[in-house]
Structure formats: C-alpha cells, structure tokens
C-alpha cells in the first residue's frame, strides 16, 4: 500500500469548477479536498504550485495486444498502459474482439483478454466487447457478460472490414435490440464495408496500390452515410448509441441531426482526428503515408480538426479517445504493392492529453473545465464509474494528474513510451504536460520517469444501466409501444 500523499498549493479542476485546494490521499482514495491541509510526518508531499490538479485521463478506445490480419498490435497491456500513464491517462477501456468466425464465444474472448491484461496493466482498465457476427447463443452470452461478475456495459459493432469483423444491418439491429434490453451501450464503427470492398477492387485494378488508395476507397460520405444509418437503426431499437472515432464533418453532422431529433447519441473524436489531416496519405514516402493508415481515414479537409474541437466545445461531440492500435514499420510494410494489406492503426494513448490541451485549451476553443469533461469525466459517466473516476472529490479514486499548463514538449518517437518505431504526431509541439501521474494513490509517472509495476492496475467492472445514458429509457420505451387496431369481424 502506498503511503499517504498530500498535493499542496495546486488548482483543482473538475468539469464543473476550478478552485485552489490541497488534496489528501490515503489508501488509494481521496479523503480530503480543502485549503491548507497539514501534512503529517508519514505523508508524502507534492508541491503543485502553478499547476493544475486534474482527474486522470480516461481513454475509452484502445486496442492493446490485439490480433488482426495475422499480426498483433505492438503495444501490449504493459507497454500500452505505461505509455498511457506517461501522458496522464490513468484508465483505458480496451476492446475485446472474440474470434467468432473460429467459434470463440463472447465469454471465452473476454477471459482471453483478461488473462492478457491482468498480469501486465499498470493502470486501471475496463473492457468493451465486440460482436462480429450473430449466433443463436449471442443474446444469452450478452446477458451473462453484462452481469456484475463480468462487468461489461458496452458492445462494439463494426460496419467495416467485410468477412472479418463486419456485421450486417440485421445483425447490428438485433444487437442493438439486445443492448437496449440489457441497458448496455452500443458502440459503432461507422463505414460501409461492402461499398469499400468494391472500391478497393476498382482502385487496385486501376493501378492504385499505395496508401493513397486507402483514403480514396473510403470517401468521407461513406462515414457520414454509415453514421446516419447507425443512428437510424439505434432509434428504431430504442438503443443509445456511441459513435467511435468521428473523423469527418459529415459524420459529426449526422450525430447532431439525430440528437436534435431526440436520439441518445454520443460522438467520440480521437486525438489523431483533432490534430492531423489526410494529406499524409499522399506523401511521396510510401512508409510515411502508410503510418497514417487507419479506418475511417483522416479527413482530407484540413479544416476538419478545428471544427471537431469546436463541436466538442459546443457539446455536439462529447469525449475524446485515441483508437490506439499500433503497428510498426515492418508490419505496415506488409501492404507494399496492395494498400488493402496495410494493417490499420495508429498511436495516441500517450499523447492525447497534451494534444487535446494544445488544440483545445491553448488555442482558446475550450476552457480547462471542458477539457476535464472531454478527457475524463464524461467517459466516467457514460461507462457508469462516476464519481469514482473522473473527479477530484472525497471518496473518488486517487487517479490524479499534476498538469503543467505552461510547460511544452515536442512529441517524438525517440522519447515516447510506445513499443513503436514511429509516432504519427512526430514534431508537434504541445503546451500542457503531465508532470506527475497518480494511479489509485500510487505515483506511476513523475518528472519524466516511469515508476510502474506490472499488474498493479485493476480491472474495473463497468456496470450496466448507466444513469447518464439510460435515465430516460423507460419513458422512451413507453412511447414506442406498437399500436393495435381492434376491428369488427
């Protein structure tokens, strides 16, 4: 057990306020937040003068140690969570993708992910489970896995990657119906896999083999169409829906439209989409271009990143993730001669907190309180762990970051903590640096050095029926009951 800890002289920032206060931590829990706390002799003291004391970041979208396309992502649960805490993130929600096509059940896939993660994680984590095909037993397994024993309250559905991860519309709709029954959140990757497949075939036939083919096979309208379709299906199922990695203006517009109609829709842009654009796919250096291959691809419109940040400021989009899914240069090079074989994925879990501060707060678009909301507290609310996570308050877990808003750092593969030989944010200078990261009362990162212990992180059960998501569900259900007309024979 870590010794008691007091953070002195800092400015506490929550989503709903900023104030000067000290923070006392004991046994991994915040036990006091008030001015002028006296440090007892056995208490470790951190001076946070001119620093912000913020809730640790929650990254709701990672793929650590994920097998796909015959490869495995380079960040396992140790390296991935080390990178996370080095950047000020104290919890990740990773996607478990059971191998349905080879007969693996949801429960077996869940157990496989737990066996990988539990011995390695150095910060807390939760799981979201992907459903990649519908089987007769799927609904029953969903019910089991949403029990407190398993602690899963969201399921992911892919509208892309035909013949591997993609579900048909009828499968997606059935899955959403089950999610609604279980009070679990449907999370959707929005593309049109069937159209993409045809466009890939056409582009290759025309001699387009490089990474530029990836973005050309996935026009921005495809993400927008799929986002609209996912929202329509969710509304028909009376199921709240969470759109992962919102990359384009059209997708964001579809979310806003459906929210205006009364649907419960959450939009998650990612760090890459808030800082970069799709010009990288046309770089003459093949490997440079391949490093940015992800799906949906980065927007071709250079004004999109700023617009997405403004939509976060306005509450039209709601939280930030990373889709951290790292493949190194050797793995990316497997797609030379055929862009469809380039493994899709990028880094982000270490740099999200600084990138969002730079592009959001330092640029003047959002304030520090909104920053806390979109990097931590909204995720905690959606996944039903607030205020245990996502808040500096008595009784909350001591997941805390001492954040220097005036410090700068230049992102580089030479200094990052990913198991990766490049960084898509290479050379970006960011204001806002996590100087100290505390995970449940344990200092895991301090002034440029990791102090992590593999396995010290904990699996956090994510319980179904989050009030933030489902508080109006029963009323909505009553309004959409089928109507029966009684007729005389």
UniProtKB/Swiss-Prot annotation:
Listed GO MF terms: dihydropyrimidinase activity; hydrolase activity, acting on carbon-nitrogen (but not peptide) bonds, in cyclic amides; metal ion binding
Positions with a binding annotation for substrate: 161, 295, 344
Coiled coil: none
Tissue expression pattern: In L1-L2 larvae, expressed in body hypodermal cells, hemidesmosomes and in a neuronal cell between the pharynx and ring neuropil. In adults, expression is seen in body hypodermal cells and pharynx.
Residues annotated for Zn(2+) 1 binding in this entry: 61, 63, 156, 323
Signal peptide start-end: none
Catalytic function, reaction form: 5,6-dihydrouracil + H2O = 3-(carbamoylamino)propanoate + H(+)
Post-translational modification note: Carboxylation allows a single lysine to coordinate two zinc ions.
Cofactor stoichiometry and binding remark: Binds 2 Zn(2+) ions per subunit.
Name assigned to this protein: Dihydropyrimidinase 1
Enzyme class: hydrolase
Family membership noted in the UniProt record: Belongs to the metallo-dependent hydrolases superfamily. Hydantoinase/dihydropyrimidinase family.
Pfam families, A to Z: Amidohydro_1
Binding site for Zn(2+) 2: 156, 189, 245
Entry's Gene Ontology cellular component terms: cytosol; nucleus
Localization of this protein: Nucleus
Keywords on record: Hydrolase, Metal-binding, Nucleus, Zinc
Any one of the GO BP annotations: pyrimidine nucleobase catabolic process
Native species: Caenorhabditis elegans
Assembly notes: Homotetramer.
Modified residues (N6-carboxylysine): 156
